[in-house]
Amino acid sequence: MNWKYFTVTLALSGVAIALPAKADQLDTIMSAKTLRCATYADVPPFSSPDPKTREMVGFDVDLCKAIANELGVKAEIKPISVEARVPEVKLGRVDITVANLAYTLSRAEQIQFSDPYYVAKEMLIVPADDTGKKKADFEGKRLASTKGSTSELAIKLNKSDPLTFQDTGSAYLAVQQGKARGLVANTMTTTLLVNESKTKGKQMRMIDEPMLLEPVGIGMQKDQPALTAKINAVLHKLDDAGEINKIWEKWLGPNTEYKMTRNEKVVPISELKFDPIP
């Protein structure tokens, strides 16, 4: 026998045996009887402290609790910053991130996304007397947004000229003062501003065609196929039962200040027609 070969082989085998396999996160969740959910620390109506109880409340909080209930475990809400949404789940400090997390190519390289449960939109609002009807009508035109935002990216992708500000209020004021032809922001913000303009300032209207589509899903660690499959199955079940719509109506629906309607169904991201954000 070649003892040198045997010794090296045995040593290598020992190294291989010593390396732990990646733990099955779904098994860990079920054993701990706890689903650790990362949500926004203070971004209503998604997740923010209740002024009276100081408990976290909002759309994302209720969705996390609904998922945990389907799994038969307790939901543990962990408030985090906007910037921590991807790192927290990537590093395994939480099991899932439920924080209005839009799909982007860079995020998808780091974490696993569930099937989207709604599609966020970057929308354009303009003065009511503006003749533009679709986003192509605003190519080369100056549009306002917050600096470094998805809204600014949407303007650039439309080949329009971005005029950016540190906050939405300043960007909106620029449109009211005629310094920009329109404002690009998310659906909630633009809806609020259009409603506000009915009684204050220059009346605005929304262009029907979205400037950009952003599928929103749940973030998980990569290489956890059992957890991914289970979360997707739960989302589809909640959607089919009308539970996601109930949560939506409570926090974002027509009877709230946001007056938003959810028309989407939970579907694989591959079935959506959209241009992924880098």
Identify the residue ranges that each predicted region occupies:
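Short helix-initiation/N-cap motifs at beta->coil->alpha
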Residues: 61, 76-87, 147-148, 163-177, ...
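Extended ligand-binding regions for polar small-molecule ligands
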Residues: 61-70, 137, 141-142, 149, ...
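Extracytoplasmic small-molecule ligand-binding "clamshell" domains
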Residues: 24-100, 109
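Beta->alpha turn/N-cap motifs
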Residues: 38-43, 78-83, 92, 96-104, ...
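A ligand-binding cleft/hinge motif common to bilobed small-molecule-binding domains
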Residues: 84-87, 101-109, 157, 181-212, ...
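Periplasmic-binding protein-like
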Residues: 41, 119-126, 195-235, 254-278
